[in-house]
Amino acid sequence: MAVLIRRLEEPDQVDLFDCGDEPLNNYLRRHAWANQQKSSIGVTYVAIEEGAPRTVLGYFTLATASVPRDSFPKKYVRGLPPYDLPLILLARLAVDRRFSGKGLGHALISEAFNVALRVADDVGCRGIIADAYRGRVEWYSRYGFVALEGGAPTGPERMFLDMRTIRMALKQP
């Protein structure tokens, strides 16, 4: 299966997408396009099969964010000015259940890293944050994300990945 990852387009078929998590399904179906085109508060990228170029297999959404410097472990902010850190928020990431276990999650997060590097080079940002569901913390950790202190005890875990780690992993200067 040849997969292409690109920005969400209005004619993309999102109604049948089902990752097993209704808030993630609803976001893609009801909000992703408007947030991208009308509100400019996030951009959604979709994985599609080249043979079925409108069927969404998975997606991620990126937005800008800033977080107070004191939310980070000292090793990540040593030597930085006392400002909030500019970041990219990995706001959503989901794979349709029909395509789970085929490496799409890896492909999606890898593309998110590539987009983040381009943004960092163009406007500057320190890293990526994600609010990982409790059952997905280990998955994000495998990519180098670390938990930030002060997260909600019952909600998602706020996690951080330094842009330098992404550069090293992708072997970019």
Where are these regions (language model features)?
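Short coil/loop residues immediately preceding or within conserved phosphate-binding loops
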Residues: 42, 85, 125-127
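Short amphipathic alpha-helix that is part of the acyltransferase structural core
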Residues: 1-38
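Alpha-helix termini
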Residues: 35-38, 117-123
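Conserved beta-hairpin
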Residues: 40-64, 71
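Conserved acetyl-CoA-binding loop-helix of GNAT-fold acetyltransferases
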Residues: 101-115
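Conserved active-site tyrosine of GNAT-family acetyltransferases
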Residues: 130, 140-141, 145
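C-terminal "cap" of GNAT-fold acetyltransferases
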Residues: 124-135, 149-173
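Conserved acyl-donor/pantetheine-binding loop and adjacent beta-alpha core of acyl/acetyltransferases
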Residues: 59-92, 100
